[in-house]
Each structure stands twice: as C-alpha cells, then as structure tokens.
Regions:
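OB-fold ssDNA-binding interfaces and closely related basic DNA-contact patches used
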Residues: 1-137, 191, 195-225, 238
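Generic recognition of cysteine residues
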Residues: 95, 134, 149, 165-166
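Elongated alpha-helical scaffolds
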Residues: 137-157
Length: 238
C-alpha cells in the first residue's frame, strides 16, 4: 500500500480513524450509490462517461493470522503453507443512504445532507456478475442499488436496481448546498478508494506468515570460500 503524507490541519482528518467496511444485517434492505469512479473531470466530479471503479485481490483467511493477500509470485507457496486455496474478491466504495429496515429513504435526513455513510465494500468475485447485470440494464452512475441481506453471516444479498440515484440528485441540484454535499461525498469516496487495498487484508511474506503461525522462520545463509575471504581481506588491506 502506498505511503501518504500530511501535516497538522491538512489531509489529517482520517488519521487515527478506523475504516468501517459495509456489512449487511440479516433481514435489512439497503439503498446504496456507487461513489468511486473510473474517471474524474477537472472539477473533481465523475466524468460524463465514468463507470464505478473496482479493485480486486486474491486472499486466504487463516485463524490467528487474518486475511493474507496473495499474488502470482507467492500463490502456490502461500496456499501450501496455509493449507487453503486463495479466493478472489473485489472491492469498491458505496454511499449507504439513510433508510428504514425496508430500504425506504429517510427523506428528512437526505434533505439535511445527513445520515449517509461512505464505506468500502469487499465482496466475493462470484457476485460481481450479478452487479454487472444490474449495471448493464440500469447503469449505476445514474441509478442506485437496493440490496436485501438474506444472510448476515455469509453476506448474501438480493440485488435490484433502483430507478433513482441519490448521489446524482445532490450533484444535479440547483441548490448549492446540495451540490456541496454531493461533491464532498465524491471527494471522500475517492480517498477511501485510494486506500482500498488495505481492506482486502495484509501483504505478508512467507516468513511473516510462518512467524504468525509460530513456525520456525528461515534465516539467510551464505557460504564464502577461503579464496574469496582472502580476496576480501586483501581489498580491505587487512
């Protein structure tokens, strides 16, 4: 993950704050907008032809270690060490709008520009085709998504496109206050997406994982011939 820089009073609003990922509660319906985008204009708002932006990673969960991100360079060795196959996940950023349990928008909170939450969402890549089908029929930049959680433990959802888009209602409003709310949502979501890699898990070396598992960590060894040693000493004039 990239290192970010900041100073007192500048870009330090989220320092020390723990990001809360979106997780559904069984029996509850949510209304969400996709708020990270593939392209932005000079004004910082999503470009006309922008689509929702996603990230992806393979990871393995191991009790006592957590979620470990794997890639092509260590996949085979990590799977052997953790005795599990890696799974593919995708991530994006949602604006979860204030609603009742049935997913009906809290209009009063919406009018006040309050009650929404900007949250990263990590889901199994097996669910991505469901999102793609919804997007193909009703593009997300112009429509919201209604999601009913049928199983909070396994994060199973029934997903249906919603005809409105709450984010666009803010951005396209003639009311400058609403426009500013929309702009602030986009700006915050962009920062969250820039750091979404950390939401997938931890980047660890093989030795890091061995140490977390309480196993012996390999130590680097090297052998130097007597001729090489003499040459090194000669170079040092010893």
């Amino acid at each position: 993950m990239p290192v970010t820089t900041f100073t007192f009073g500048q870009d330090d609003n989220n320092i020390g704050k723990k990001t809360t990922r979106f997780k559904g509660e069984t029996g509850r319906t949510y209304l969400v907008s996709f708020v990270s985008f593939t392209d932005y204009g000079e004004d910082g708002l999503p470009a006309e032809d922008a689509s929702p932006a996603f990230a992806s990673a393979h990871r393995i969960y191991k009790a006592g270690v957590g979620n470990v991100i794997v890639d092509d360079t260590n996949k085979s060795e990590m799977e052997s060490l953790l005795k599990k196959e890696s799974r593919h996940y995708v991530g994006t950023v949602l604006c979860v709008w204030p609603t009742d349990r049935q997913g009906e928008l809290d209009v009063e909170s919406f009018k006040k520009g309050k009650g929404y939450k900007i949250m990263p969402w990590i889901l199994s890549a097996t669910r991505y085709p469901d999102l793609a089908r919804c997007h193909k029929k009703f593009p997300f930049p112009k429509h919201d998504l209604s999601m009913t959680c049928s199983d909070g433990q396994y994060q199973s959802f029934t997903m249906v496109s919603d005809p409105k888009c709450c984010l666009r209602m803010y951005l396209d409003s003639k009311n400058e206050v609403f426009q500013k709310v929309g702009s602030s949502i986009v700006a915050e979501a962009r920062k969250v997406f820039d750091k979404i890699g950390r939401e997938f898990g931890r980047e660890m070396t093989i030795d890091d994982v061995r140490e977390a598992l309480g196993e012996e960590v390999s130590s680097p060894t090297s052998s130097v011939s007597s001729e090489q040693m003499e040459s090194m000493l000669d170079d040092l004039e010893i």
